[in-house]
Amino acid sequence: MSRFWHFKKFYFTSCYSMQRMRGKIFKNEPLVPMNVTSEHEQVQSISKEESRSLSSNDLNLSADSELQLESEPEIESEQLKNHEDVYEIIRSMVLAADTTLPRLSNNSLTGIYNHWKLNPNDDLPLYNPTKYTPYEFHSQYNQDRSYIITPRLSVTKLLVSSWCELRSFYQVYSGSVRLPSTKAMTQGTKLHSKLEAEVHPEIDTTEIEQFLISNAMSLRELQTTVPAEEETVVIDLGEVEQLAVDWAEMLIERLFSLIMGAEAREILLHGYLNLKNRSFVTNKDEIRESSSVLVSGIVDYIKLQNVTNPSDGTLFDDIHGFVDSAFDQVDNVPLVDLSQFLPEAKQILQNYDFRLTFTDVKTRSARQIPRQESVLEAAKFQTFYYRHFFHLLSRDSRFTYFSLIENAERRGHDVDKPLSILTTISLLRKHYHIFFKDFVKLANGEPIGFSPFDDSAKSIPYDFVSMFQSSDEFSLANPNHNHFLEQISAIDGIEYDSILSPLLKVWKTPPTLRYLAARASQLFNVFNENIGDITSVEYRYNKTSELLSEKVYDYNFSEFQAEVESASKFWNGEREVIPTEDLSRCSYCEFQSKCMVAGGKTTEAVEKKTIGPKIRQFLNECESSSKG
């Protein structure tokens, strides 16, 4: 009689038996995963007696449990013998006697064998033997803890068919082990930074920040009379501050640059994918539903242009003409009032047939583009995701505002927490042309002209005065800023007397993530009627930034939605995983040595090799059933 027949025969009866045994003997203790070794661990040789011991441990039969077993009078000895027979059959199918546990060649294999509780002599099964969907597992067992703290996906994670779906599948259940960075990846990152700096030159505020920190530490000793609950945070380098900087620079500044200069790089985008109906959320009430998964991405390049005449710059002549005539200047830089600029810019854009195009940049270590059709298709769909996200974020400023608020709150951030003084002054220095007029409004407690923010902004005293003094002239009652302004102006020559002096007071409304969400949502909405359907992928040589090729695509919503549905079914565990048919790709895969597809196994061999994993699935189901 075959082993598989034994398995089928005992499948239902033994699950019931295991539940009874767990209830009376094991006290619902969890199933302990087999301790699989990696190449860094010693190979274990298991004798016939050790085989029994290992299997007992695997089923959580400790010495104490066996003693307790003997002390249970209500369990008949014959019944125990039957139970032992069941376990003996299971053990014989899962782990043979005199077995040597092989070393697994990398951490990804070690992770998936431990998570799936597999015998390391077996190949990897082609299906998931656990109760967790890929998304559930990704959100609970992930080497990057930020995905556990804030469950979410990225655009690239949705492109599961790019190389091999089976590899993507195994990567999830390995615990999303990070692969080591390669030289090509490092060079690619440098190229992206270089391209970004060409459009958005970095303003180095290191010296100013060091001066402010040093000055703040000197003044702290003098501020002994300020109650702790009234003290404004001066220095905070936490996650809220980092998100604030990202929103200010990778949303507000980039979108403003897109309006003023026709192009922008590295813009943050996001959407909420409803895994139940396999589509992206389009109304704010649906954002908070548990089935709506946050999906984030960064689009490499967006250009605003006349698609029929790319050299046409009349739109930007009009916008610059308006800005130069409407706003005062400091150091020949207009101080833009966003409350006035946003509606005017939107009106100007509507008068022109200019459209946004969306580009992703792929870096290559050789002067050739990918030959695999699936890789090219995935790159195309990546640009479709970015185009779709921008469309959703530009449709309705209220939707985008609440979408950003939800984004921050899912990360555990308080959107009404005042930003630190250091973050505020840094944003002011780098982007005073955008933020100065708004900061004046916040300081005076004036509305910014966006009702969702104006109606909900909290009035919290924000001390933007005490820290901007020198220690030799410090006073809480009568602050004197003359020496301080001389010192900070000497660092980089900016007219701080013009952009800082009007703000040196206790603000009535502090700068917060909520404020940044409001302005970002309005800037997205400026482009509401200018979303184009052209996307492209640039392939660049990472050593020289040479453009090797550019693939241009027309956005197709039906085609895109089919891709979204397929990705949703993958992450929901609603369809079978499709392995690659190109086995030459397997040589680049960390799971190759244990993959049945990579090994070219026949259908009969694959069926035979899945018996062991089916037993593991059975054991996991019994464990879940006993806990329920």
Swiss-Prot record:
One of its GO terms (cellular component) is mitochondrion. GO terms for biological process: interstrand cross-link repair. Its cofactor is Mg(2+); [4Fe-4S] cluster. Pfam families: Exo5 (PF09810). Keywords: 4Fe-4S, DNA-binding, Exonuclease, Hydrolase, Iron, Iron-sulfur, Magnesium, Metal-binding, Mitochondrion, Nuclease, Transit peptide. It is found in: Mitochondrion. Residues 1-21 form a transit peptide. Residues 38-52 have a biased composition (Basic and acidic residues). Residues 37-58 are annotated as: Disordered. It is an enzyme of class 3 (hydrolase). Its EC number is 3.1.-.-. Monomer. Belongs to the EXO5 family. This is Exonuclease V, mitochondrial. It comes from Candida albicans (strain SC5314 / ATCC MYA-2876).
